[in-house]
Amino acid sequence: MINRGPKPLEVLKLVHRLGASCVLGNHERSFLKHLKKGSQSSDSFSKLKEEMGDHMPFWEEWLQSLPLFVSEGEETEPDSFLVVHAGLAPGISPQDTDPHILTNLRTWDPIDQRPGDENHPAWYTFYQKSRTIIFGHWAAGGVVMRPNAIGLDSGCVYGGSLTALSWPDRSLYQFPAQSIYYPPQ
């Protein structure tokens, strides 16, 4: 919601007004750290803080209230799912996982049992449970459709598409970006 488009405050207001369920992502965590430290490390964060004005404490509290993951159904039920911003460490419950992993993970090093680099396989290749994990965060990985993992990041911010998932039929809907909001790296 934050730091990947031209109107982050409007996005926050829309999500809040709709009462939408969402999870905390890496940019929201970074923004909260920015607020806590009072640093000036990010022009976009400083600008957003300024736009929030007197309502900044409200938005800070609301962002802090967002969960790191949302689950529906029991883990063994066929249509159960868990939504997380980035990924899960294989073999570790989300409740016991470092928030940095939940909001930043892309690849996994199976030897050292830790987040990997770009040469390691995607984390979801090691995920063996039946509950479907729905995630984003990795535009370069594109849309992923596996029996137990669905990746929805299709690079909208980079001029790709915005991808939505209908559950439980697993239908995908894509809408082309209206612009390139953030240049690809």
Regions from the PLM with identified roles:
Residues 1, 20, 27-28, 86-88, ...:
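Active-site metal-binding loops of divalent metal-dependent hydrolases
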Residues 94, 99-185:
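Acidic, His/Gly-rich catalytic cores of divalent-metal-dependent hydrolytic chemistry
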Residues 4-86, 90, 94-118:
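Active-site neighborhood of divalent metal-dependent phosphoester bond hydrolases
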Residues 1, 21, 34, 83, ...:
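Short glycine- and Lys/Arg-enriched binding-loop motifs that mark or flank ligand-binding interfaces
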